[in-house]
Amino acid sequence: MTEHLTDLSATVAWILQRIDGPLRVGAPLGIGKPHRLLNALYAHVVDQPSRPLALYTALSLNPPKPGSGLAARFAGPFISRHFGDDFPRLAYVDAMLRDALPAHVQVEEFYMQSGGLLHSTQAQADYTSLNYTHAAAAVAQRAPNLIVQKVAREPGGTRLSLSCNNDITQDTLDAVAALGLPRPLLVAEVDAELPWIGGTAAVDASFFDLVLEIPGPSPRLFGLPRQPVTSTDYAIGLYASTLVRDGGTLQIGIGTLADALSHALVLRHTDNATYRRVLQALDPTLASHPAVQASGGLEPFAIGLYGCSEMLNEGFKQLVDSGVIRRKVHDDLGLMQRLADGTADAADAARLADEGEFLHGAFYLGSPAFYAWLRALDPRLRSAIGMRRISEINQLYGGNEALERLQRRDARFFNSCMMASALGAAVSDGLEDGRMVSGVGGQYNFVAMAHALPQARSVLMLRATRASGKDAASNVRWNYGHTTIPRHLRDIYITEYGIADLRHKTDQDCVLEMAGICDARFQTALLSQARQSRKLRDVPEQAARAQRNTPQALEGALAPFRRDGSLPDYPLGSDFTDTEQRLLPALGWLKSATTGKTAALATLMRALLSRTTGDAACLQRMDLATPRSLGDRVQAKLLAYALQQTRQQ
């Protein structure tokens, strides 16, 4: 019999009554965590060494701290407005950041908020290196006695939905049972903010041992602020968009590269003439690129795409709304086989239209606008979106391989990496000193699937350089002391300078392909290192494309389309006000211009000597319209100068 409670303290007491000794708790990644319940449980045991707590989870999300100086003036009001003052910060994350978890509390994560825990010994030491598809088995091996999860309630009904996280809860229960272990207690916290998703994400309330429903409004869901998309991002997204085949399957990751790709696909479909003009300006030879001709296309989507991605995010909203994603699939193997054979009849077509789904994911995470879109979906559209287990989404070997091969035709798996070697290895999740930036997540799964499916391609996207000016360094490296994707799985890489197709190529060919998408400043050194390592024989002159592969040439090529709005700063919408959108580039410029003592002093002197009065609205937003102290006046001058510099760009 499922218990129903409305009080956090009573829920914690109920759990502790039923579990003797150590608590071994599983919780979903991302927004599926019941923050309030986890905080209450942590608060109860933090000072009780007799009650050890082990938490198995990933991607524990807390809003950023405001920082100091100008950054705090910007971030403080934004964080309050965007996340809400009542957002329940995860206490264990704040403790980990200080390495302040007590000895009897351990948090194991297989994926971390990107870069957020690089300086935490506790987080780094207890990181677990796992493919997303292996997480359920790893949790089961630890014999969890409690799983907690946030759920949505069915409007006008009695069922509950795993909604944002149908990823590993059911897989974990199956793995626990396979080991002959007792089923853990399952506790759900109902969140009124969480969108209802039916289908395989829906369960009866009896699936849980206890359902907690706290009265009153729920805090906002954690919302990712939508970030500005740069010309570099757009170039990468535009190149990537040419590798997508109509009628195919699409997986995309997260971040501004994915945002740029989503916008480029929408532009290709809704304004093909402009799309082709942008591509012509970016690279006049792109349409004849062998990879584009063999694997992609430039035409609008007559059939549409099927979205199959571990994470559903902002880009998918845009792709669904614009009609790019609309190719439906069905879980009936016979029907899918007949569609593939061309023998489907009118009844099959009607059933596909009525029962099929065009978008599958395992979890979702996005902005408040994305969650509002999910909540407001027309029922018929909502029924075409299915939240599935990660064992279904991220691999072919979950028991339905024949079906999934038919559904995932012409699959394109787009993911980001930080660096790539000239021989085709990718660095996506960690540093060469062993520290983890994030985690492999599903990236390996998708790369492997691209090699397992016919006509599928894995595309890893990266910016050609990091930092700028004299501090610029190439992200196309000869080698690096950490690897996420090994070179024997090399496929396609994209930077802002083009497409490198490495699949089945020799090492020399791979080096030349990667040099072709490297920043011009670093091509010579890269090719020289390759020669020293005996990976090059004679290098043709055309291998170096120094004139084209520069930031200045790229900005010049895309500038007209940035100005006319074809490539907007915020293609998926913005969570920042117009004033904040002017402030962001100014603050970014100022941070770069004050890195190092000499640069900081020079920038300060120029700012103090500048006669610019600044942007009144921006100064008001930063509470610097009427500076009250010497420090305030210096900050106001620096900000006004930075606004002047970025206004001129």
Segments (PLM) and residue ranges:
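Conserved alpha/beta enzyme-core scaffold
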Residues: 1-649
